Amino acid sequence: MGTRERRDRSNQIDKALRVSFLKCANEHLSRPELVSLTAVGGYGRGELAPASDLDLLILHNGSEKSELISAFVNAFLYPLWDQGLVIDHSVRTRSETREIATQDIRVALGLLDLRHIAGDSQLSSQVATDALEDWRKNKDKFLPKLRKSIQDREVRSGELAFLLEPDLKEARGGLRDINALRAIELSGAVPISLARVAESEALISNVRDVLHGDNPKSRDQLLLTEQDRVAFTLGFSDADALMLEVAKAARAVDYLMDLTWHRIDSTGGKSWFNRRKNQR
C-alpha cells in the first residue's frame, strides 16, 4: 500500500476512461476535438483509494447543441455506471465552471486539483488556470468559508486523534484537513511546510486503502471490528499500536492547521505574496 499504488490505480482508470471518452465524442459530436475530460478532487491528485468515487468534470466550449452534449455524456457514463463505478460528474463550459466556482467553495476546492485526462488539453489548462487565479484573487472571501467548513466538520465528525472509530477523511486531523492545508498554501496567504505532514498523510492514506480493500463497500470510518485486520496488514503488532500511530499522525496535522490559522490571523488578511513584494 502506498502512493505508488494509488497513482497506478488512477492511471489504470485514466486509460479506460480515455478510450471510452474519445470513442463516444467521435460518435456523438460534430467537433469532438473541442471537449475534454478532467479529474478533480482526490482523483485529480491521482490519490485513488480502492473504493473512492470518481470525480469527473466534462468540459465543452458551448458550440455543440445541448442534445448532442447530452447524448454524448450519457453514452460515456452509462456503461461506467453499469460496471459499478461510482461517479460524481459535472458538465460545463469554461465560463460556467468559473462562475459556479466563485459561488461554491466546494467546487473551487475541487478545481485546484484538476487534471487533464482526454480531449482538448488547452481547454482543461485554461480552466485549471482560471481556478488557481480566482482562488488567489478571492482568498479573503474563500478562506473564512474554508475555516467555517473545517469547524463544522469537526462538530460532525470529531477529532481523529481521540476517537475509537475515527473517520479517516472527515475527522479533524484527517485527510480532508490535509487537502485544506494544500488549498491554503495555494492561496498564497501564508507559506506552509506541507512536508511536515507528509508522513501523516501517507499513514492515514495507507490505512484507508487497506480499509477499502478489505471491504469494498466500506467508506472511511475505521471501525473497531476492522482495526486488527488493518493493523496486521500494515505490519503493526495489534490495533492499539496502529491507533497510536494514527493518533500521532492526526495530531501533527491538527498542529499544522492551528499554526496556519494563527499565522493568517497575525497577518490581518494581507497575503504572503504581497508582503514579500512590498519588502523588496
Q: What do these predicted ranges mean?
A:
Residues 10-18, 24, 59, 67-122:
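Conserved catalytic core of two-metal-ion nucleotidyltransferases
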